[in-house]
Amino acid sequence: MKLVSVALMYLGSLAFLGADTARLDVASEFRKKWNKWALSRGKRELRMSSSYPTGLADVKAGPAQTLIRPQDMKGASRSPEDSSPDAARIRVKRYRQSMNNFQGLRSFGCRFGTCTVQKLAHQIYQFTDKDKDNVAPRSKISPQGYGRRRRRSLPEAGPGRTLVSSKPQAHGAPAPPSGSAPHFL
């Protein structure tokens, strides 16, 4: 029984290490995937480029009537001026511009996750800030609250505080009148 368990342990480790040390040809796998991707992209670009002209030379060389279908024409007039090469060129230009603008809802600016979080936080702040009023609560305005009014209503100088005036004083000069605002350190 002991021999069987040792043999199983030996075979298991051999199989594990053998599979671990077997070299995979990563470069050839990558090359295969790359070639497949490049081939499919080339086919897609070939189909797209043959569906509509890409430049002015293609418009002059190719037939212009294929770009304007009778369904696309507005109005009942079917004059020969509407299907002229100039009209077709304008039509192609508008078509290309609309396709470039429609390629997904492009968002300009930062595309990182942190920027998205900051934008969302800013929007939340804007939405919630409109209901707030700019007046402090009465409990904060009172003499027991915080702010300028409390500092004004405090007693002049307590035993643990020192008064410092905003104006420099000479030695032996009298203290400033009680009407001026003292500064505490």
Curated annotation (Swiss-Prot):
Location of this chain's protein in the cell: Secreted
Role summary: Numerous actions have been reported most related to the physiologic control of fluid and electrolyte homeostasis. In the kidney, ADM is diuretic and natriuretic, and both ADM and PAMP inhibit aldosterone secretion by direct adrenal actions. In pituitary gland, both peptides at physiologically relevant doses inhibit basal ACTH secretion.
Protein name as it appears in the record: Pro-adrenomedullin
Propeptide: 45-92, 148-185
Modified residues (Tyrosine amide): 146
PANTHER family associated with the record: ADRENOMEDULLIN, ADM, PRO-ADRENOMEDULLIN
Region (Disordered): 60-87, 133-185
Tissues where this protein is expressed: Highest levels found in pheochromocytoma and adrenal medulla. Also found in lung, ventricle and kidney tissues.
Listed InterPro entries: Adrenomedullin-reg_peptide, Calcitonin/adrenomedullin, Pro-ADM
Site (Required for CALCRL receptor interaction): 116, 125
Gene Ontology molecular function: any one: adrenomedullin receptor binding
Family: Belongs to the adrenomedullin family.
Any one biological process term the GO annotation gives: negative regulation of vascular permeability
Cellular component, GO annotation: cytoplasm; extracellular region; extracellular space; secretory granule lumen
